[in-house]
Amino acid sequence: MKTRDEKITVSDGLERLPEPALKSDERKMARQKIYALLEDRDATLTFEEDDPLEQTMVLNMGPQHPATHGVLRVVLKLDGERVVHAVPELGYLHRAMEKLAENKSYHEFMPYTDRLDYMSPYSNNTALCLAVEKLAEIEVPERATYIRTIACELARISSHLLSIGALVMDTGALSVFLWTFQEREKIYDIFDLLTGARFTISHCRVGGIASDLSKECAELIIRWLKQFKPKIQEWRKLLDRNRIFIERLEGVGVISKEDAIAIGLSGPNLRASGVHYDIRRDEPYLAYNDLDFEIPTFENGDSYARYQMRMLEMEESVKIIEQALRKLPKGEVRNEDAKKTFPWKDEIYHSMESLIHDFMMTDSGIQMPKGEIYHAIEAPKGELGFYIQSRGEGVPWRLKIRSPSFCNLQALPKLVEGGMIADVVIIIGSLDPVMGEADK
């Protein structure tokens, strides 16, 4: 056995390995000697200069990798299994959304917003409509405002279900992923009944919504909420007591309150670091000012806190939907100003005036006033904002999208550097990015 002051090289003992012709007993003794050297805690291991273990390695993770949650490429510099440096590379799903908006009327651009955060398309529709309505000073009927609120919270639950299910699957468990997808399918059935489409819905309209909330749809939502609430508690009992799940997330990907603000995090990722900020409460829009709900926050700023945030937000979304259904007012669901909104589709087939009105709106679009506006909402991923610059035409001169996933991914290098390569997958899942929204 080597003394404390003596050094052992990796090649020490290896260079005296027996030749293949040696007996098995001699070969066994040589192996035991090497094992004894490696188990000596007082010995100091040194490596030769050309040893590959002394060199850092660059690893490409993605863009075609199931753990990156989309076409995200992360270039990792590794020292063994520890991440020394990380560079996220975006743009693989870039479709020039902002440039396309400059050649589309505000109504024509609505379906494009569905393809931003395609996990919660209703939130994207709502954000664009609110920005346009704010610039054009269009009043939206109160019933339409409440229906938008209900649909946005359903979209939030749907998005968080996917996020939690995928995160748990990243840790090696598949069951929760299947359970969350079962509930998402039920939400899609609700959207199908409400909007006529399950996924890319384009239900919002400037000045209101495309169709009213039927009694049948409202009853379906109530029945689903009743059976969904206990399931959240079941999942929390299962995951919050699972030692493997907790150890994979707790203390992994920690970011402080100050760093989260400096980088520009928003949504659950920001509140998980202790920042008590939610646009629904701090800058109320839709019907949130009339509803009672809590804004959960955590101080740890790690992956486990981000998971907890989304679990608690689903519970609050259930409360919001229940209140909105109870308070749902009667009345119209769309502004009837002929210069700012489209006519109803069923009127076009029977009225020449409505047909001409629809043709003019399709050809010229809404004649917006000159000016600029920025409006943001609390989307499931964070602050989703639309900046519109108008020259008084039917199309925007400039439309800028503030996507939360793009801003949240800026924190990725800080979160993964110094951690293990196995934790990179967990950290990306806890951030919950959507690349369609990040790349635009």
Curated annotation (Swiss-Prot):
Pfam families in the record: Complex1_49kDa
EC nos: 7.1.1.-
Superkingdom of this protein's organism: Bacteria
Single GO term (MF): NAD binding
Catalytic activity as recorded in UniProt: a quinone + NADH + 5 H(+)(in) = a quinol + NAD(+) + 4 H(+)(out)
Main enzyme class: translocase
Claim: Iron is one of the keywords in the record: no
Gene3D superfamilies: Cytochrome-c3 Hydrogenase, chain B
UniProt xrefs under HAMAP family: NDH1_NuoD
PANTHER family: NADH DEHYDROGENASE [UBIQUINONE] IRON-SULFUR PROTEIN 2, MITOCHONDRIAL, NADH-UBIQUINONE OXIDOREDUCTASE 49 KDA SUBUNIT
Name of the protein this chain belongs to: NADH-quinone oxidoreductase subunit D 1
